[in-house]
């Protein structure tokens, strides 16, 4: 998948996960714990996560990923296409483990990010959905996300969707 593509042919998914763990611990990374909402069950087990940030901040937030990728994988992602832009609270990642799917957790996390977008005064919440994931696309459409344009990210054909806040 896209994680292996980002790590490159000579590196493992385990190495990629180590990079991501370092980025999560940083304050100024797009994957920072500060940009992450976590859903847990009554036993404190992670039932889902969503990562979002102001699209206008992508370039500054991505610096840490670029540094880590250069150092760990020897790959320079400086020229990587932006996946978001100014004017949207961008949902970078949404994940719900298989055991917790179908319980409304993704909807709850999406609603929380939509609320965050309102509080920030941004005009929209945006995301990219893989064209090969109709289930996710249906979830977003059911919640009010609208098609904006086609995009390619990480070698995958994507659709850029937005939830209008104005």
Which residues are covered by each model-predicted region?
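Conserved acyl-donor/pantetheine-binding loop and adjacent beta-alpha core of acyl/acetyltransferases
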Residues: 54-89, 93
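Conserved GNAT-fold acetyl-CoA-binding loop/helix
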Residues: 1-24, 70-71
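Active-site rim helix/loop that mediates acceptor-substrate recognition in acyltransferases
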Residues: 13-36, 41-42
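C-terminal "cap" of GNAT-fold acetyltransferases
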Residues: 123-137, 142-144, 149-166
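A short, internal acetyl-CoA/4′-phosphopantetheine-binding micro-motif in the GNAT/acyltransferase core
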Residues: 40, 68-70, 74-75, 94-101, ...
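Conserved GNAT acetyl-CoA-binding A-motif
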Residues: 87-89, 101, 117-128
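Conserved beta-strand in the GNAT
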Residues: 38, 45-54, 90, 95
């Amino acid at each position: 998948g896209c994680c292996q593509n980002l790590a490159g042919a000579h590196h493992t998914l385990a190495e990629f996960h180590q990079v991501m763990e370092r980025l999560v611990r940083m304050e100024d990374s797009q994957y920072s714990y500060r940009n992450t909402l976590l859903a847990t069950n009554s036993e404190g087990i992670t039932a889902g996560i969503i990562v979002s940030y102001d699209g206008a901040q992508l370039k500054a937030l991505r610096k840490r990923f670029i540094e880590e990728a250069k150092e760990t994988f020897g790959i320079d992602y400086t020229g990587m296409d932006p996946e978001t832009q100014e004017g949207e609270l961008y949902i970078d990642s949404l994940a719900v483990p298989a055991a917790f799917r179908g319980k409304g957790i993704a909807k709850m996390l999406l609603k929380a990010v939509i609320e965050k977008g309102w509080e920030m005064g941004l005009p929209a919440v945006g995301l990219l959905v893989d064209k090969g994931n109709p289930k996710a696309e249906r979830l977003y459409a059911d919640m009010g996300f609208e098609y904006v344009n086609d995009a390619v990210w990480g070698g995958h054909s994507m659709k850029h969707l937005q939830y209008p806040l104005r």
